[in-house]
Amino acid sequence: MTDSIKKDAKARMGKSIESLRNELAKIRTGRAHTSLLDHVMVEYYGSDVPISQVANVNVEDARTLTVTPWEKTMVSKVEKAIMTSDLGLNPSSMGTVIRVPMPALTEERRRDLVKVVRGEAENARVAIRNIRRDANNALKALVKGKEISEDDERRAQDEIQKLTDSHIEEVDKVLAEKEKELMEV
């Protein structure tokens, strides 16, 4: 009984951290990386699809991405999608290749991004704590239904607390990495 609750909590906490990593990958640092454009959607024959489904995205150098659409007709649509995304990038096309230079971040912009990153990390911590609460409530329901003893509940709660602590520690590590990456000049 308690094992399934713990497994569920662990899986959900892991998903929270994975979600945090995905959100942080979208936040632009001064360096170019292909996952930066992952969430950019391009209109392709009437439906919006991720850019990775209509073009190759490569890193040309530390500050430049190259996007090569598979169809020549898609060049302008891909360029427009990158321009209108919330990333603040200004692509330029050269024939069938779109170059996306990464502008250097100002100190002020870096600080703003750090605030955003900290907010995302806090959201992940809150999600993990909510998962802990759900697990503890499930344990209380089992005690109430006389399916487990109070001692078993206490042991399980302690284990869930350890899980919570380790996952929050992981969130802090991810946050520290991203902050360090953002503050690099």
Curated annotation (Swiss-Prot):
Please name the InterPro entries in this protein's record: Ribosome_recyc_fac, Ribosome_recyc_fac_dom, RRF_sf
Q: Which PANTHER family match?
A: MITOCHONDRIAL RIBOSOME RECYCLING FACTOR PSEUDO 1 (PTHR20982:SF3), RIBOSOME RECYCLING FACTOR (PTHR20982)
Which one of the record's GO molecular function terms can you name?
ribosomal large subunit binding
Quote the HAMAP family the UniProt record gives.
RRF (MF_00040)
Give the family per the record: Belongs to the RRF family.
Q: What does this protein do?
A: Responsible for the release of ribosomes from messenger RNA at the termination of protein biosynthesis. May increase the efficiency of translation by recycling ribosomes from one round of translation to another.
Gene3D superfamilies per the UniProt record, alphabetical: 3.30.1360.40, Ribosome-recycling factor
One Pfam family, short name: RRF
Name of the featured protein: Ribosome-recycling factor
| Domain of life of the organism encoding this protein | Bacteria
